[in-house]
């Protein structure tokens, strides 16, 4: 099965991507992993991407698409894959369709993790990170014994800039602006499946797996 997983920040996409891919026995492919491997292996694409990242710029679509194309040529994806973090735009989606068509394949389904904005804000703005060991706690879901102090090492806990409520709200706005056309694109093709991402991790995974049974027939 070939699928794409999309969802807003705080939807648990990384966790679900790993669990769903494991259930399907297909590789989880994330753009972050692809970037890191290309940079670590000092490939021509990795060197090019690093130039942009070091300058604080976004890696151009052409470089990202080329990296994904290389990855999808691997032997381990012949029976399927789960893409996490790609495509992000309609342009990238069209390029992905073209890549797969060249190989005589197609995308089977796009899973969209659907979660309430207020829940995303609760999940992310409640996170506290240890300044010493970098362990992440949560003021509601996984609080330390002593407020502001890490149970593991006694380090001071702080709130990352990315986890501040106003930053989270802005990230959500950007996500919806960028992703709405992509969601419409896949909905028009009839391969979009919404998954309720509220509740415990294992319940969300169970919903996704149940939905995928329909698409694997």
From Swiss-Prot:
It is found in: Cytoplasm. It catalyses: AMP + ATP = 2 ADP. Zn(2+) binds at residues 130, 133, 150, 153. GO terms for cellular component: cytoplasm. Its main location: cytoplasm. One of its GO terms (biological process) is AMP salvage. Its EC number is 2.7.4.3. Coiled coil: none annotated. Residues 30-59 are annotated as: NMP. GO terms for molecular function: adenylate kinase activity; ATP binding; zinc ion binding. Pfam families: ADK (PF00406), ADK_lid (PF05191). Pathway: Purine metabolism; AMP biosynthesis via salvage pathway; AMP from ADP: step 1/1. AMP binds at residues 31, 36, 57-59, 85-88, 92, 160, 171. Consists of three domains, a large central CORE domain and two small peripheral domains, NMPbind and LID, which undergo movements during catalysis. The LID domain closes over the site of phosphoryl transfer upon ATP binding. Assembling and dissambling the active center during each catalytic cycle provides an effective means to prevent ATP hydrolysis. Some bacteria have evolved a zinc-coordinating structure that stabilizes the LID domain. PANTHER family: NUCLEOTIDE KINASE (PTHR23359). Monomer. This is Adenylate kinase. The lineage of its organism: Bacteria, Bacillati, Actinomycetota, Actinomycetes, Acidothermales. The gene is adk.
